[in-house]
Amino acid sequence: MFSGGISLSGISVLQLSSCERKNMPFKISLAEWSLHRTIRSKKIDHLDFSDITKNKFGLSAVEYVNVFFFDKANDKGYLNEMKIRADDLGIKSLLIMCDSEGNLGDPDPKQRTKAIENHYKWVDAARFLGCHSIRVNARSAGSYDEQIKLATDGLRRLTEFAEDLGINIIVENHGGLSNNGTWLSKVIQDVDHPMCGTLPDFGNFKIEGNTWYDRYKGVSELMPFAKAVSAKSYSFDHEGNDTQTDYYKMIKIVLDSGYNGYIGIEYEGNELG
């Protein structure tokens, strides 16, 4: 079902003792997307995620993905089962990554409002599970500046709703202009709300075709607003180092920003997960 270990910065997390992990300058969580192939193939169930995180990988914090329990957002019985399983294992539920709920920067005002309201149930679910945030997307359409205004509007309105429930709205570089660090940092600045921030992803900086935004520059731009971090990996060399990202350089950027929260392992390659 699973092969290999979980690596971060060329070091297998499974090789570290609990004492060594406690002395690390950051904490490690597991993003559920890392297991998307085994979940979608029905080899494991979403409800087993906490158990696998704890007993297979030795980690104690998780990041859920809404598409794996998409029809359960309002099912308190199901959410309670998730919560019980996590709590019984000492697992900390950090956030829910939310997709397929519309574009928060949709140029159509009605569609933008619908997208905002579609996320309300996930804010409620996050609060129930004890998460600090939901991760959303800032997709839009139009000119560069028009998309800034549209995404800012959608994010601000959703954040104002989530504020009353104590849940942060965090935006990942996850498609469209959000893969441009300058653009996304400008949007967050314009939202101008302490509960709206970023979730910098080490790998999602593809602009279009073979054009990529500099990932180190992008993460540097997004870290001042970060409330979570996604350590994206696709493949590793024989020494366990990521083949696309210099993790030593990237982790230094994260730590130099003053961030000391969780870094979520997110594997998106073809060999594991």
Model-derived regions: residue spans:
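Structural motif
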Residues: 57, 224-226, 258
